[in-house]
Amino acid sequence: MARVTSVTLGEHLTGFVGEMIQSGRYGNISEVLRDALRLMEAREQRVQHVRDMVLAGTNAPVSHRLMDEIFSAAVKDTSV
């Protein structure tokens, strides 16, 4: 369910939002903010995934895999 929320933006962000709307990429401020929040949510999920991987590695026994193999797997796991 949609909810009306008031947001105060500084001059820089207000200008940026205006540019995005003027470019035609977005129709209004709400579209800009929703897209920005979706991107932020996705980034936070990736950060949490990396944190979980670090914690798992910290708690795991010693690995016999080469560092290159571990790094390649980590890059593959964090790719979106």
UniProtKB/Swiss-Prot annotation:
Q: Which UniProt keywords apply?
A: Plasmid, Toxin-antitoxin system
Q: Tell me the Gene Ontology biological-process terms attached to this UniProt entry.
A: regulation of DNA-templated transcription
Q: Which InterPro entries would you find in this protein's record? A: ParD (IPR022789), ParD_sf (IPR038296), Ribbon_hlx_hlx (IPR010985)
For this protein, the record's Pfam families field holds:
ParD_antitoxin
Would you say which domain of life the source belongs to? Bacteria
Tell me where the signal peptide lies. Answer: none
UniProt-listed Gene3D superfamilies: Antitoxin ParD1-like (6.10.10.120)
> Could you tell me which NCBIfam families the record lists for this protein?
antidote_CC2985
Task: State the function annotated in the UniProt record.
Answer: Antitoxin component of a type II toxin-antitoxin (TA) system. Neutralizes the effect of toxin ParE.
Similarity-based family: Belongs to the ParD antitoxin family.
Supply the name of the protein: Antitoxin ParD
Please give the organism.
Answer: Yersinia enterocolitica serotype O:8 / biotype 1B (strain NCTC 13174 / 8081)
Gene designation per UniProt = parD
